[in-house]
Amino acid sequence: NCIETFLSGRGLTQTHFELHGTSLRAIEIANSTNAACAVSLNIYSQQLAHCLATIVNVLDPHMIVLGGGLSNIQELYEVMPEYLEPIVFTDRLLTQISPPLFGDASGARGAACLWPLE
């Protein structure tokens, strides 16, 4: 199982289905006020924090920019420092977790910039 299996829209949908037996799209889970959806999003957030902590602990980046459709979930940016702080090796989290400047299509724009002009 790779990170993408869990830390993607499809992964959030699958986690929710396995926990609660209902199939919802990731954006529906993220936007819901339902307690079951909150549990699923919390698990996703904790899994993301553990993944990002590995990156922080190995590379010590100044900033990590989240990408893809789930980067639109504002709650991730609110809870991530709280979830990361106890699991990074430093005394406090110095890495900023940020949304993409041009939205969830930023990755596609960046890839297009790599295409040769000639």
Cite the ranges covered by each PLM segment.
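ATP-binding/phosphotransfer module of carbohydrate and carboxylate kinases, centering on a glycine-rich
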Residues: N1-E118
